[in-house]
Each structure stands twice: as structure tokens, then as C-alpha cells.
Amino acid sequence: MAINTDTSGKQKALTMVLNQIERSFGKGAIMRLGDATRMRVETISTGALTLDLALGGGLPKGRVIEIYGPESSGKTTVALHAIAEVQKEGGIAAFVDAEHALDPTYASALGVDIQNLLVSQPDTGESALEIVDQLVRSAAVDIVVIDSVAALVPRAEIEGDMGDAHVGLQARLMSQALRKITGNIGKSGCTVIFINQLRQKIGVTYGSPETTTGGNALKFYASVRLDIRRIQTLKKGTDEFGNRVKVKVAKNKVAPPFRIAEFDIIFGKGVSTLGCLVDLAEETGILLRKGAWYSYNGDNISQGRDNAIKYLEEKPEFAEQIKQQVREKLDKGAVVSANSVAKANEEDEEDVDLDEEE
């Protein structure tokens, strides 16, 4: 078959077909990638510098994000920090509290403007996802958090008798809703965060027996999946004051995946931003540690990590100076644990078959 080499004729035909598509489907239905300025992905900070680094800058705007892990691992805390960051920039946030467990006092302590936070506590999964879809389509809301997928109970299950079998109902509900919501998210630029719980597969011999609720659709549609785990309890003497958590970027469509970040979550206060800063400053060589002592430019500033964090709390100008130097080092390509890629496991690379739940 001969190839048409008439460049001007091809360009004229291309212009005509592009105009026809735009008339039929609306402006922006098709575009050159170089012209699509909104394709440059903007991000939302998670409140943890190490996690932002592992994500390639933060949570991407206008995408579906899944945060999953065991109970009390910090899933809701990370989502509330993202809401606080959006509100600081003047954005509007919504929280769909399907678990009926939102603590306004704790949210306020994390920096969330609870007076202007939109909150919904729907009775059924259908209601919750319809509310999410309407908020997304309005293009007036910048971030929506759903807590959690496991609590999105289908209407048939609520209205049915205890003990009735409802096989695959929630998976089908999530699959239908995500097909509808995802297209609207792309047009409105709203970020949607689904918080999810873990369950155990029965009879698994090889690989991880853990799986998330709601079927496979969310795994497929999510641009970012964060696996968050508690790895250590922080104590002062016998008193527990927080958790050390590890977050693995199990999936990332906008930056390299499989990176791992660690940070502290302090009870009643949320993510320890200065704790992240101390860790990154040590890894980049800005703060040197010899034994238990931390030093800066040859001068000892504190003994122990907790005292180093306290020192930065008392000297915000010095903390900002350290932060700027850390950013400069990272911009020049400094390699730290949060921006190096961890080895993928079998679960991360599993194929997702949506046909199973249709």
C-alpha cells in the first residue's frame, strides 16, 4: 500500500478531522500531547517529606489513589494531611465517612479546617459513590476522601437478612462506580483517595495471603497505591507516644514505583515533619551523626534523634535552612532510601483481571 507523502494534504485532512471530533465530542476531546498543559501532573504533599520523595513529589492531582494497610497503621492520618495541604492552598475538600469514625478534634490537630470540610455519612455504598461522583463532576471540589472501601455496603446487603449470601456484590458496585467516576476525575482535576482495609485469602500456599476489599477494579483504576504498615512503637520509658510506619509505593503511574518511605506518626499530632527532615538531613550528609550525637558544620547540636527534632522545633529558622539545603542536595540527584527503588514482590506484579468480577 502506497503511503501518502502529500504533507500539506495530510495536514489539511488532519485539521478537518480534529475539528469534526471537537464539534461532535466537545473541545479537548482530542489534542496534541505537547499542547496539553494540564498533562503536567501537579502534586499534593502528604505531610511526610520522605513519602513525598518516594512518590516523586507527592500525591498526583486529578487521579485515583488507594491507601491500604492493617488497622491503626496511619491510613486516615495520611489522607487527612493531604486534605489539610489542599485547604492551605485554598482548595475545597470532602470526606465521605462511610465508617462513621471521623474524629474532628484529631483532624483539626493535623491542620484540617473542619469548619469548611464537607462531610457525608451515607447509609449505603451506592449512596456514597453517587455522592462522590456528583462532587467530582461539579469541578468545585479539589479532593475527596472515602473512608473506607470495606464500609461501602451494597443496599441489597443492608436490606437483606443476616446470613444472606451476596457474592461479588461489592466488587461489582466498585467496578461500575469506578468506570463512571474515573472519566469525570480526568475532566475536573479532582483527586479521589480511597482508604482500604486488608483481608486474608483462604488456602493460599505461595505468595502473600493478604488482599484488599472491593475486588480488583480499584487496583486497576488507581494511579497510585500505598501500602502502609506500622513497624515500631515509639516510647519514652514505658509511655507510648507514636508509631514508626513504613509506606511502600506498590503502584505508581506518574513516577517510578516500589519506593519505600519511613516516618513517624505522633499520637494526637500526626506525621512528624521534623522527624522526616532529620532523617533526610542525615542521609544527605547535612547533619552528621557520630554515636548518639548530631552535628552541623562541626558543631554538636543534640544528643539523640528526639533531641535533634526538639532542637529544630525550637529553632524554626535553622530548620528552614536545613530543609532548603536538603532540597538542594536532592535536586542535584542525591540518593536516599526514599528515592531508591525497592525490589518488587510477586503481589505487586500480579495481573488484574476485571472480567472475574463482572
From Swiss-Prot:
The protein's name is Protein RecA
Which residues of the sequence carry a binding annotation for ATP? 69-76
Q: Which InterPro entries match?
A: AAA+_ATPase, DNA_recomb/repair_RecA, DNA_recomb/repair_RecA_CS, P-loop_NTPase, RecA-like_C, RecA-like_N, RecA_ATP-bd, RecA_C_sf
| Family membership noted in the UniProt record | Belongs to the RecA family.
Keyword list, A-Z: ATP-binding, Cytoplasm, DNA damage, DNA recombination, DNA repair, DNA-binding, Nucleotide-binding, SOS response
* A single GO cellular-component term on record: cytosol
The protein's job, in short, is: Can catalyze the hydrolysis of ATP in the presence of single-stranded DNA, the ATP-dependent uptake of single-stranded DNA by duplex DNA, and the ATP-dependent hybridization of homologous single-stranded DNAs. It interacts with LexA causing its activation and leading to its autocatalytic cleavage.
For biological process, the GO terms are: DNA recombination; DNA repair; SOS response
Write down the HAMAP family for this protein, in alphabetical order: RecA
Q: Gene encoding it?
A: recA
Could you tell me the superkingdom of the organism this chain comes from?
Answer: Bacteria
The cross-references to CDD domains, in alphabetical order and at most eight, read:
RecA
Organism, by scientific name, is Trichormus variabilis (strain ATCC 29413 / PCC 7937) (Anabaena variabilis)
* Any one GO molecular-function label of the UniProt entry: ATP-dependent DNA damage sensor activity
Cell location: Cytoplasm
Q: Which PROSITE patterns match?
A: RECA_1, RECA_2, RECA_3
